[in-house]
């Protein structure tokens, strides 16, 4: 007989609370703590960001990865059959974060148009992470075409990731009671099609990182005081750990290391359910440690006047004033010429 997950109705109608109730309690406490810290950070950043609304939007879009992942993990524990929907929601925000990072770098430089103008003709290296090992690649001049190409790589990964996740969600809905169980595993899309899709996803992720890295390294001198690398690494390490730690839990569950009653699981519940609860609790623990570290890097000093963005704006204003003065000085000479 195939092992199936209990529905939320089954859990409510049961005479006893679910055996993973300690996981739910711990996850709830940590999630509430993260949400409280998120509200505090929102109020603090909002106070200093009145003149930088786009920068504030991008910053908080990135920071929401930690509380949102924790909240979705908690929902997956409370409502087991909603795990796939919660996971899709979390991964959707995660892939959108690439766009937030791109836009954040551009706002530091005064916007997209200012970035293109500032970096036009700058020396840049093609061998940037993750292609940094290819030292034989030559240096080239930054161009608008390269900027558009880097943008395209980031948008392509985002769109493909959302489309693939949505497709899995649709197929899961169609599978209804037949999914999930141990024989089918944790993915609805299986076989060669699954291998092709997820391999392509990894390749697109690789190039999305390359596109973001290409823009950053070209403007590295202007962004050196922004801690962009630290901001990106704390986010990316967190999301990569979340993705790859599931392999560890699956191995532990299927070798019965986590499977007896002393860990709070009865044999009537599926191994897949045990994996998900352990994984969800681990996400909550990791988020509560990673979120304060991220807040340390995304401090309110970014909003203080005198940053790169302000300097670019002031430079543009000065340039326009000079042009206006030159035009004004030339107008009387033109009138005298006409009279003569």
Language-model features, listed with the residues they occupy:
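Juxtamembrane interfacial secondary-structure elements that flank transmembrane helices
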Residues: 38-50, 82-85, 101-125, 251-259, ...
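C-terminal transmembrane module of eukaryotic multi-pass membrane proteins
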Residues: 211, 216-330, 340
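Alpha-helical transmembrane segments of multi-pass membrane proteins
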Residues: 17, 23-34, 57-73, 153-165, ...
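Non-cytosolic membrane-interface motifs at loop->transmembrane helix junctions
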Residues: 82-92, 194, 226-232, 270
């Amino acid at each position: 007989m195939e092992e199936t997950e209990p529905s939320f109705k089954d859990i409510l109608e049961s005479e006893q609370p679910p055996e993973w109730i300690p996981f739910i309690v711990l996850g709830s406490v940590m999630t509430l703590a993260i949400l409280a810290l998120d509200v505090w950070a929102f109020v603090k950043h909002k106070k200093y960001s009145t003149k930088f609304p786009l920068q504030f939007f991008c910053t908080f879009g990135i920071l929401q990865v930690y509380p949102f992942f924790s909240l979705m993990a908690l929902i997956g524990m409370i409502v087991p059959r909603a795990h796939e929907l919660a996971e899709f929601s979390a991964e959707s925000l995660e892939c959108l974060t690439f766009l937030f990072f791109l836009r954040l770098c551009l706002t530091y430089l005064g916007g997209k148009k200012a970035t293109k103008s500032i970096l036009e003709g700058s020396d840049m290296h093609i061998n940037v992470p993750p292609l940094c090992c290819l030292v034989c690649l030559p240096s080239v001049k930054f161009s608008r075409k390269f900027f558009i190409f880097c943008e395209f790589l980031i948008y392509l990964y985002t769109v493909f990731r959302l489309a693939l996740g949505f497709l899995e969600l649709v197929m899961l809905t169609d599978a209804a009671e037949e999914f999930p169980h141990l024989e089918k595993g944790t993915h609805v899309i299986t076989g060669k099609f699954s291998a092709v899709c997820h391999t392509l996803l990894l390749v697109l992720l690789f190039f999305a990182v390359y596109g973001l890295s290409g823009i950053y390294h070209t403007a590295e001198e202007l962004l050196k005081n922004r801690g962009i690398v630290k901001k990106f690494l704390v986010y990316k390490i967190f999301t990569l750990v979340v993705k790859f730690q599931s392999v560890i839990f699956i191995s532990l569950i299927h070798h019965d290391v986590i499977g007896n009653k002393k860990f709070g699981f009865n044999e009537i519940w599926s191994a897949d359910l045990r994996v998900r609860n352990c994984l969800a609790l681990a996400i909550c623990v990791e988020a509560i440690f990673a979120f304060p570290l991220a807040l340390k890097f995304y401090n309110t000093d970014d909003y203080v006047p005198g940053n790169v963005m302000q300097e670019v704006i002031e430079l543009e204003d000065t340039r326009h004033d000079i042009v206006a003065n030159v035009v004004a000085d030339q107008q009387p000479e033109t009138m005298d010429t006409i009279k003569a």
